[in-house]
Amino acid sequence: MTTFRMPADEAEARAVQDALRARVVLDEPGPPPGTGRVTGVDVAYDDERDLVVAAAVVLDAATLEVVAESTADGRVTFPYVPGLLAFREIPAVLAALERLPVDPGLVVCDGYGRAHPRRFGLASHLGVLTGLPVIGVAKNPFTFRYEQPGPRRGDFTPLMDGDEEVGRALRTRDATKPVFVSVGHRTGLDNACAHTLALTRGFRQPETTRRADALCRSALREAAG
């Protein structure tokens, strides 16, 4: 695992993203959907106390049963800046991943990978630092454009930045808003979408994200006292 160092300011943070982006691996397909383990990571904030709590929940990819889970909390030490949110979240997320008693397998972030102004969102950043295959599944398209996919589960359209496809708008339930899938590290876009569909058997959001969201919110309530 590569050591994370907090940048001193926004300019240094952008320089870190630009430097690490060259280490993103895009020519691996990633593990097959429905095999091994998948891990959801998410964070929750107490802004009044500058507190962040991260959760990591490992599921069996075939059954979606919980295998292991962990949490970590810490102080928020980087300001809220669009495009630099990873620097607020990664220290706690890394700590939560390190506390897991099992290998996490594929990691699913509630956020972006290549679908980022510098092509280096949280999913890519986390992948480069850990060496794990990571995908991003977000609830909104950030600043990118897309056409509405067809109404059926599995329908998708490209998420575009100019002429470049940076992800996909993917329908995970019939007649429900799409989610926005992008590659983080050591996965392909087709495979990332297949994993997302395998993890959304009854809801719009992946089960990994739903579980991690619930756990970090519960842990935040306990940490905030």
Language-model features: where?
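Short hydrophobic alpha-helical runs that function as membrane-insertion/retention elements
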Residues: P133-A138
